[in-house]
Amino acid sequence: MFENQPKGLFALALANTGERFGYYTMIAIFTLFLQAKFGFDEGQASGIYSAFLAGIYFLPLIGGILADKFGYGKMVVTGLAVMFIGYLLLAIPANDNVAYWSMIGALALISLGTGLFKGNLQVMVGNLYDDKRYASKRDTAFSLFYMAINIGAMFAPTAATAMTNWMMGRDGFVYDGRIPSIAHQIIDGTASQANTDLVQGLINSGAIATNYTGDLVTFAHQYIESLSRSYNYGFGIACLSLILSAVIYFSCRRLFKHVEGNSKQMVEDAKAANNANVIEEELTPQETRQRVTALILVFIVVIFFWMAFHQNGLTLTYFARDYTASTVTGATRMGFNVWILAFFAILIYSLFSFFQAKTSKSKTIAGVVAALSLVGAGSIYFELPNSFTILPQQFQQFNPFFVVALTPFSLLLFSALGRSGKEPTAPRKIAYGMLIAALAYCLLSVGSMGMPTPAALSADANLLTNPASPNLLIGTYLVLTFAELLLSPMGISFVSKVAPPKLKGAMMGGWFAATAIGNYAVQITGRLWGDLPLTAIWGILIGLCLLAAVFMFSMMKRLEKVC
């Protein structure tokens, strides 16, 4: 899996891990911040969230076009600097009016910086495999690169949660997902008697505040201010992670400097060095059209996947906050301690290394690491309290954990199928991924039956008498991850492989532009989050995923011609 890969892959993957850690720390709490700080309802928060995600994934198209002219490395470095300024702006607490426009400016800068950084870094990874010595390892490389992204993402919700708990605890408050919305109702004078009594009861019991004796309106203001400030400082974590990414990038630059230029520069450099290993592909106009058409068809399909997948920061977070039990017990506690998850990931990789090792020394080392990982996970687990409270953003650590943990199994499966000549093509994997994404929302739909609508629950927080088990969302994320592993790294690899050489940056940007459209469409379910039953909301996503799968299978012959 890791053998015979160019060293530049690991350097670029680590640089991306740092940047993604900061980004996913922000995403884990962004919609919660919008509702806590500004009192936005789900529809308003959905509009801002989806527009931001659209910018994040659309601007790589512009970044790719610029990189095709000026070079990939220059755009990556510029992107890091621009993102840093954006996250810094978002991390500074301010009053409501200033905070709103400061946030808009920050989101614009983060989107622009990501547009320059994200796609071009992935093009550089793909360019490493234009060398004939590594060309056969392209799919594996993108799976490893994708895994590295998710290592950063796995720790992000824990970082955000730690900051929230620390800041609120310092101010004498305890987080409760029901309170921000009700606090704004109290401030506006629209809170129902049931919600007012609920908050007063929680204050009197000490469940959400320590020794608070003031009136409810003052409490609401102070609670919102404390929570909002904790989110600001959570965004500041992204600044630190970008500094780490920059250090890794510049310190390891010698390992990938040969792929920093645009495609024309790279070919000229290879010719000057008489490097016969670099693949210089010349396409006829007809072949170019066929490839671009195939890519556009794939782009159409992935729109619907990302619309379904990126509910994680929106409706799935709402579901975690409003409909899911906020206390965990038993074995489920393991999933909400990121260090236990990390030890399990290490255990999986060490076991793979053990069975793949060719020497007794390597087997011994892998075996020792596996044993220590098991001991580490066990020692943490047995020290956990019998039950503890979880925050909604913590559910977002499951998807990246599953990606990291399942990637070796995915690579092993497709490697075995490849050796027997039965490995599905990238387009076929994408189609299967759409079917599995539909299955994930079928699971969530069944678990949501009989629950009150979001609008009814907002009016009376006591209506939900039997919240969903955390395992329902964990299972949903697991099935979505199976879909993601079939679609995302394979799609990126497909673009890298099929894109005409002179259009690589633009085509990778096209992939992200399609993702942007899907992310903008995320708000559809967010805006429907109100009077519609939950099963109807999930049913919309099921239907769209199934339609996309049918479309993909209908175009399969055309797509497989260019593979």
Model feature map: region roles:
Residues 1-7, 131-139, 164-387, 410, ...:
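Intracellular loop-helix junctions on the cytosolic face of multi-pass helical membrane proteins
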Residues 3-53, 309-319, 378-388:
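Helix-loop boundary and gating motifs at the non-cytosolic
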Residues 17, 99-120, 453-486:
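Hydrophobic core of transmembrane alpha-helices in multi-pass small-molecule transporters
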Residues 42-43, 132-145, 231, 389-390, ...:
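Loop-to-transmembrane helix entry/capping segments in MFS-fold secondary transporters
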Residues 49-68, 154-156, 397-414:
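Central cavity-lining transmembrane alpha-helices of secondary-active solute carriers
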Residues 66, 125, 163, 413, ...:
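Hydrophobic alpha-helical transmembrane and interfacial-helix anchor sites in secondary transporters
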Residues 68-80, 136, 356-367, 416-435:
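Cytoplasmic membrane-interface "Motif A"-like loop-to-helix N-cap segments
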Residues 79-98, 375-385, 432-462:
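C-terminal ends and interior cores of transmembrane alpha-helices
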